From Swiss-Prot:
Major enzyme class: transferase
Protein name: Methionyl-tRNA formyltransferase
UniProt GO MF annotations: methionyl-tRNA formyltransferase activity
Organism, scientific name: Mycobacterium tuberculosis (strain ATCC 25618 / H37Rv)
UniProt keyword list: Protein biosynthesis, Transferase
Taxonomic placement: Bacteria, Bacillati, Actinomycetota, Actinomycetes, Mycobacteriales
E.C. numbers: 2.1.2.9
Gene (name only): fmt
Region described as Disordered: 34-54
Amino acid sequence: MRLVFAGTPEPALASLRRLIESPSHDVIAVLTRPDAASGRRGKPQPSPVAREAAERGIPVLRPSRPNSAEFVAELSDLAPECCAVVAYGALLGGPLLAVPPHGWVNLHFSLLPAWRGAAPVQAAIAAGDTITGATTFQIEPSLDSGPIYGVVTEVIQPTDTAGDLLKRLAVSGAALLSTTLDGIADQRLTPRPQPADGVSVAPKITVANARVRWDLPAAVVERRIRAVTPNPGAWTLIGDLRVKLGPVHLDAAHRPSKPLPPGGIHVERTSVWIGTGSEPVRLGQIQPPGKKLMNAADWARGARLDLAARAT
C-alpha cells in the first residue's frame, strides 16, 4: 500500500524503519510535528522521525495546523491508501481522517481501552500493572476510541522504567503494525469495537506531575519514580536545592531501624534513605543542578547535609 507515516519521537522509529523495509508497502511521505527548540541554546531541531526520513530521501511534512483545509488538500494530492500513526502528537480531525480509503491506523502503547491518552506506558507502571502491551486501531475523532485490529502483550518487569518498557513496546509494536497493515491490504482484517468496560485515561505527564510525593506509601513512590524515568524525570527539593532522582529501592533487609517521617533523610556510609508514608526507600542515583547523575551516598557526603534536612 501507499503509506504516509505519521510520527514524531524516537519510539516511532522502529515502526517507520520496518515499514520502509517492507516489500508490501511504500512509504511515500512522513508527517511529523514542526521542528522544536532543543538543547541549551534552544535551537529548533527536527524530530527523530523527520531526521530518519530525510536520511532515507523520504519527503517530510511538518504542518503547524494539520487539520487545516490547506494541509488536507496537500495530503489528498499524495493519494495515500492508508496512513500509519505512531506517537504523532496531535489530534486529527474528520476531513483529514477521510483522505485515505483505508483510514488512519494507530499503534498505541497500551491494551485498549486501558490507558487512552498521551502517557499510557507511564500510567501502567505508576498504577502497578503487571501486563501491558500495544494495540493497533482505526483512528476516530474521539481520543483512542476506534475499533481494534490487533494487540500484542508485554510483561512489566518489577524494575522497568518507562524508558525500558517503551523500548520493548516500540519493537513488538512495530511488528504488530506491519502485520496489521498487511492484513488490511489483503482484506484479511476487520476491526472490532473496543469494549465499553475497562476504559482508563493516561493524560500527558508534566514536570510538575513528576515531583515526588513523599507522603505516599513507599511502593507507590517507587512506581511513580520509575514511571517518569527518564522523562521528564522525578525530582524533589532537599532544603532549597532541586534535584532529580533515579529509581529508588524498597530494600527491606537493610532499612534503618529508626522511623523516618515523610521526606525525612537518613544518611549512612553507603546509602541514603528518605521516609515515605509507610517505610523509607533507599535512593539510587541523584542529579544535582548542572551535574550528571551520581551515586546518592557519594553526593550526600560531598553535600554535607544538615541533619535536619528534608525532602519536599
